[in-house]
């Protein structure tokens, strides 16, 4: 990125730790502790909607930056994160709003006004679409055997997949589809352990990504147009 940087992550995920180690940068691992009362509420049937993890992590990193003397916080949120998941009653609803540009500017402005006027908060990937990101990531082969974007690997409670990719969730579907135009088939299948597009039972999941008869999943995935573009590009390649 043209400047000194530290790879920072929050929590105890060995997958994230392995990716951070592959960067070759100095690392900093932060931890947080959730109140056990939260899980008691869940068991009692409390409403449990989406947790804006990026907003929470951003606040933690602001505190860490002040304590440890950093002058900037760089996320990797792409342009597509600002797009609505759907429109409801005339209002845009975005599952990943705290990854979008509107939140980024709000927090940046608030931090400057109330915390530190010289602390930058931004995303390096903001100008790029998801496909522009995956096209570049496809060249970074050192991460292929350690990275995962499967949400089931990052559950706080409950079972996790035996492998890095469950192959069933919208995140697995989207990352597979977004990487497919830019990687040889044998490499892509090697990352995921199987060809997700060969499994007819997965078709409804891919249809949702394409926004075919359904809205985009409530997950941090790319725009429907990007998924359609990826599938079109893949269709032009020999089998």
What are the language-model segments listed below?
Residues 1-239:
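Nucleotide-activated chemistry modules centered on ATP-dependent adenylation/adenylyltransferase
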């Amino acid at each position: 990125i043209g400047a000194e940087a530290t790879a920072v992550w929050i929590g105890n995920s060995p997958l994230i730790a392995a990716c951070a180690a592959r960067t070759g940068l100095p690392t900093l691992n932060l931890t947080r502790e959730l109140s056990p009362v939260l899980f008691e509420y869940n068991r009692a049937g409390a409403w449990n909607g989406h947790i804006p993890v990026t907003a929470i992590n951003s606040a933690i990193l602001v505190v860490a930056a002040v304590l440890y003397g950093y002058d900037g916080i760089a996320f990797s949120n792409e342009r597509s994160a600002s797009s609505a998941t759907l429109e409801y009653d005339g209002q845009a609803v975005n599952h990943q709003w705290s990854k979008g540009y509107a939140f980024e500017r709000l927090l940046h402005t608030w931090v400057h006004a109330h915390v530190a006027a010289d602390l930058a908060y931004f995303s390096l990937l903001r100008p790029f679409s998801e496909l522009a990101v995956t096209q570049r990531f496809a060249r970074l082969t050192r991460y292929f055997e350690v990275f995962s974007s499967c949400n089931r690997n990052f559950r706080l409670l409950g079972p996790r997949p035996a492998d890095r990719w469950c192959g069933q969730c919208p995140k697995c579907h989207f990352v597979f589809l977004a990487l497919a135009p830019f990687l040889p088939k044998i490499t892509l299948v090697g990352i995921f352990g199987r060809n997700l597009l060969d499994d007819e039972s997965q078709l409804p999941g891919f249809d949702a990504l394409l926004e075919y008869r359904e809205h985009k999943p409530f997950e941090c995935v790319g725009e429907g147009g990007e998924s359609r573009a990826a599938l079109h590009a893949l269709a032009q390649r020999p089998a």
